[in-house]
């Protein structure tokens, strides 16, 4: 099992709601083509909307990087002007714990519960980072909005930075 997990979460049938899955699919495609080099110790997983079913997937990892759509109230940001569609926000598991009653997204509370359960079962996860992308639309459809699609390269760069921050480098 790879010690670093990149987990895309979301429902690809609801446009921007599926951004996490779209990004993991993009990274997987690029890695297969050789245009994206990842360390051997990194696993890319499409988590869909599985929630607590991901317990075994995240258990025992040194670092878990979750990519998901997030909705954050503008007043919760130091700079509300930067919270528009396509904005990328970084959260930690500790941030989720402090906001466990807040509704960051449809998945973040489930993620918090899954992480808590992993700890209770002795399957602790090391560092958890959530890269959240603010959606423009959650309408039915398969394509990302232009604003969210434009954020994809930035999110991939941030994922790569998170990977190298723990000392893992492409082989």
Where are these regions (language model features)?
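A short, acidic, flexible beta-alpha connecting loop/helix-capping segment that sits on the rim
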Residues: 135-137
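N-terminal catalytic or cofactor-binding beta/alpha core of small enzyme domains
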Residues: 1-120, 124, 130-133, 142-153, ...
